């Protein structure tokens, strides 16, 4: 089976303007599977916590894909997963829905514990009104997720985000 290699570098524009890297990546390997997750923070002042959103997305994707992989094996669902159709769609949708729901919970809990600072609010000119109304608060942590799960039987790739 393949080896997973991970590298994360801060872009030259971010270095030049002293902007933190808003991206994150993680890998996990076991005897039965290899998992990777890469999250690309939005790089927008209206999303001042993209760095945290990316970290949460990767951590949750890795965790949920571990559970997914185990469930597929324990329930003998490999054939359902690799055969195109309703069962395949349902299994993959459940995985993505679980990742998004847990990410949304994580960012909402983090925001409740650490409300936006005045400095963060000052950069959120486009969306500050809706943030003040408590709407679309997850956008503060905006990120796009790409993740993969590799086993001896299948490679599953998912992408979530950038649905503008």
What does each model-identified segment do?
Residues 1-164:
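PP2C/PPM-type serine/threonine phosphatase catalytic domain
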